[in-house]
Amino acid sequence: MKKLIKRREIPIGNSVSNHPLLDRLYRARHIQNTKELDRTLKSMLNPNQLYGIEQAVNLLVEAYQPQQKIVIVGDFDADGATSTALSVLALRQLGFSDVDYLVPNRFEQGYGLSIPVAEMAIEKGVQLLMTVDNGVSSFDGVAFLKEKGIRVLVTDHHLPPETLPPADAIVNPNLSQCGFPSKSLAGVGVAFYLMLAVRAKFRELGIFTAETQPNFTDLLDLVALGTIADVVPLDQNNRILAYQGLMRIRARHCRLGIIALAEVANRNVEQFTSSDLGFCIGPRLNAAGRLDNMSIGVELLLANEMSKARELALDLDQLNQTRKEIEAGMKLEAIKICQNLTALFKELPYGITLYQPDWHQGVLGIVSSRIKDQYHRPVIAFAQDSEGILKGSARSIEGLHMRDVLERIHSQHPNMILKFGGHAMAAGLSIREEHFADFQHIFNQTVADWLDEEHLQGVIWTDGELNSNEFNLETAELIKSVGTWGQGFPEPCFDGEFKILDQRAIGQNKNHLKMLLEPKQGGVLLDAIAFNINTRLYPDLSIKQARLAYKLEINEFRGNRSLQLLVDYIEPIDE
């Protein structure tokens, strides 16, 4: 799909960095003063600003003496796994002796604190149930537990429904009555804040002193991993959490499981970036919840012996390889469906709805994301569960709030969607198979009402051109050092015109393009690589010049470090 390369506007304002390039990058990301660049823990928001935190802390204080059975119920993604592991570790460090956890199986119980999951917790003897990264939409499960006289503490970050579950306490920055400034906390961030508040209460009660209290900065590796892997916007507070965790990972002050996953991914933790967490560690951890059971991922993060961590990391790596194979097949089928839709309607629908009965439920979200990236359309991919219900995973584009779209469809067609939930850019839902054709039409029409043609034009936003003297390792190191980059605080991407002096396909499937480039202004020769190219278009030796969108990357090979351009998009220039 042809895309537009556009440059980010740099707002007029005071300088925020003495370095001209950094000043440009920061202001393009709406940084207005140097305080917003502070990544120290002292600048972290206070837990007491979270609505419901006092009630939540009191529930845990009451469960401390006499010791009550606490069961943590997590989610089956990386945010859920890190939230679960963090809560188990923190509560045990605080002195809670009877802490257990449950992670619903995607294929058996589905998402959230359902009644079957509540029954599993009761079998474990639960006296206080605490959700992490889920629960705000789990009305039935919470009500079921309350009827049994069991107290429930919900911690979540997902957008709440109109009717909240009848929990004893709910901590969620997205509650309408919550004034917490950072609405982008991941589930693991919410859990971390609750544990900080409990520790503070225990100090107040004399259970700990400042000297004897557990050091919860040791849990920031989990906070960083869950925050980056869940692709939540990196506002200043999340940047602090992610950066502090990343620094601890680089110093190897982290879970053995993270080190083991880095080993199987052939990554050096001492050089870790947020991209490594998001694209190497996160997918392997997520593979457990996609194809098997996320308990594998939680056990990896709880492992205190390297041999056990390595064993589980190898299991996750194999699951991830299997996931890639399943994904490749599903993506080909999805592209074929899109081609058929285009042939049928003369153009691709504004909102793409895909369904194959035998598709793997655990891989739907990735396929939706891949098709969304390829066609720049909102996408929902469905598969059938064991009871004949269609489970869907939705991914959106800028300008379309996916959960709001589903809310509108639900309000206008109350019997269409069985249940749904999510965020602006990602959501999940269930419908009946007989409603698929109607839903396909309604979703497309709703998206068409919401978006115009301009929204459907894929755009690559860049930070403009680099000068010849900026193509060096020092610039790449500088950009790496001032991250943490991610969602809402994007890694710098540049554009410019280049001569293509050499190009060749590389990789096992010959789907990566290696190039030798010279900037239009001359002065330097540059190695470049473009991953996952369209092999029907490239290599093309007739293309001698192109405008490229690219990032700076440090290529390390056999102890040597060199600059490499990581090319995101190629726009050929006619000579």
Swiss-Prot record:
GO terms for biological process: DNA recombination; DNA repair. InterPro entries: DDH_dom, DHH_sf, DHHA1_dom, RecJ, RecJ_OB, SSDNA_exonuclease_RecJ. Disruption phenotype: Slightly decreased growth rate, higher sensitivity to UV light, slight increase in sensitivity to mitomycin C treatment, no change in the spontaneous mutation rate, no change in the rates of slippage in tetranucleotide repeat tracts (i.e. phase variation). A double exoI-recJ deletion strain has a 2.5-fold increase in spontaneous mutations. It comes from the Bacteria. GO terms for molecular function: nucleic acid binding; single-stranded DNA 5'-3' DNA exonuclease activity. SUPFAM superfamilies: DHH phosphoesterases. It is an enzyme of class 3 (hydrolase). Transmembrane segments: none annotated. It holds the Pfam family RecJ_OB. Keywords: Exonuclease, Hydrolase, Nuclease. Its EC number is 3.1.-.-. Belongs to the RecJ family. Single-stranded-DNA-specific exonuclease. Required for many types of recombinational events, although the stringency of the requirement for RecJ appears to vary with the type of recombinational event monitored and the other recombination gene products which are available. Involved in genome maintenance but probably not in phase variation, which contributes to the virulence and disease. This is Single-stranded-DNA-specific exonuclease RecJ. It comes from Haemophilus influenzae (strain ATCC 51907 / DSM 11121 / KW20 / Rd).
